[in-house]
Design a protein with these regions (language model features):
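Flexible loop/turn connectors
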Residues: 1-98
Length: 105
């Protein structure tokens, strides 16, 4: 698991240079769901996060903290797994096709 899609792309390149095949030898998952992830071969499995909602909640929290520094809150936002082809399936099924990965994005 990589903390960003960009790092995942770099990891895939590094694994390839060492002769490892993704997903046959090693699985890779990114985080961010950047547009480039859909154009890789295989498509990158990634976690999508609601950037707009995170920005809105951040502004709300900062505004409240300016008025009352003790007004703290933990905010949990939903995330979603976007299945690509960089994770080896343990159940024997084939990884999603480019079309099915695009439909789920």
């Amino acid at each position: 698991f990589c903390m960003s899609d960009t790092m995942a792309i770099g990891a895939i390149k590094a694994f390839s240079e060492f002769g490892l095949r993704v997903p046959d030898d090693i699985s890779v998952i990114g985080f961010d769901n950047i547009a480039l992830a859909r154009f890789l071969t295989p498509t990158l499995s990634t976690v999508s996060q609601p950037a707009q909602l995170i920005a809105e909640k951040s502004v709300e929290l900062i505004s409240r903290l300016i008025h009352d520094p003790s007004d703290t809150e933990n905010v949990i936002v939903p995330s979603r797994l976007v299945q690509g082809g960089t994770v080896r399936r343990l159940d024997g099924q084939e990884p999603p096709t480019r079309e099915s990965a695009r439909e789920s994005a």
